[in-house]
Swiss-Prot record:
Name of the protein described by the UniProt record: Protein stunted
Taxonomic path: Eukaryota, Metazoa, Ecdysozoa, Arthropoda, Hexapoda
Deletion phenotype: Embryonic lethal. Heterozygotes show increased lifespan and enhanced resistance to oxidative stress. ATP levels are normal.
InterPro entries in the cross-refs: ATP_synth_F1_esu_mt, ATP_synth_F1_esu_sf_mt
Native species: Drosophila melanogaster (Fruit fly)
Entry-linked PANTHER family: ATP SYNTHASE EPSILON CHAIN, MITOCHONDRIAL, ATP SYNTHASE SUBUNIT EPSILON, MITOCHONDRIAL
Gene that encodes it: sun
């Protein structure tokens, strides 16, 4: 059994923890570059009555 399964977490949770620890261990200059790559953007279009409503953009850093 893998360590992350034995700990009772999913692979995604394990991967996120490992990535966070790696980013925290970087030197200051490299840490800033890694933080820029960490941002994500999601476009979401809700539908009402069979037609798309106003598009929404979500940004997370």
């Amino acid at each position: 059994m893998t360590a992350w399964r034995a700990a009772g977490i999913t692979y995604i949770q394990y991967s996120n923890i490992a990535a966070r620890i790696l980013r925290e261990s970087l030197k200051t200059g490299l840490r800033a570059d890694a933080a820029k790559r960490d941002a994500s953007h999601v476009k979401f279009t809700p539908w009402a009555n069979g037609k798309p409503a106003q598009r929404q953009t979500q940004s997370e850093s």
